[in-house]
Amino acid sequence: LKIGTVHQCNCCLGSKTLHPLVSVIDLSKADLSPHTDIKFGFYTILLSECKCEAYAYGHQYCDFSDGTLVCLTPGESISMKENNKEFPSKGWILAFHPDLICGTPLGLNIHNYTFFSYCPEEALHLSLREKQIILEFLERIRQELERCIDRHSKKIISKYIELLLDYCTRFYERQFITRSEVNKKVFREFNHLLDNHFNVKVSLSTDVLSDEYCANLLHLSPAYFNDLLKYEIGKEFKEYIQF
């Protein structure tokens, strides 16, 4: 299922269009086939409040279980069939078009929110308090959308989204803390990979030995892999191997 605009998203998920570029959608009211694969043409923040394995993207033993957050860039898909997942029957979607944040501080800095480049299996798993904070911002945005659109709407809504993303950054950093032992294991596997490469002298160029190449061997996205390295050792891939 390809959803190109915020209005189309509202139509597919049974929500009213209060603004053509942004929407907060209650998934409990959505009428969508459980195993539908969806490609979104805009930024999408998906909050699942379902506490079951069918929605637990990458959930590990050391993670909280009160909510799961997945962030998608325009043109990205979320696959239900491939991962044997179901579209959440309880939760929320924040959908916003790039035009909404064009010319705003958020528009200039959204590339800094690297979790938009994580894969769904690297989702953020929220505590109850963290989920409540996310829901509070979604409610603020929803209330602003209930007002008539005026010259202040874009600035206020984009600021709320920016603050929400700042909290997501904080919560992801907390997740790196609670996953400390898991991450250390990944780091050891990475060093073992480097040892094999340099000691065995496999005929690979430095172009092949990239963050993308190593992340793929570790079953991680390059963005998550680099953020994990930054948290564990304070350096990204290229700094660590000193190219």
Positions of the model-derived regions?
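Histidine-centered metal-chelating micro-motifs
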Residues: 70, 75-81, 101-102
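Generic protein-terminus/edge-of-domain signal
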Residues: 1-63
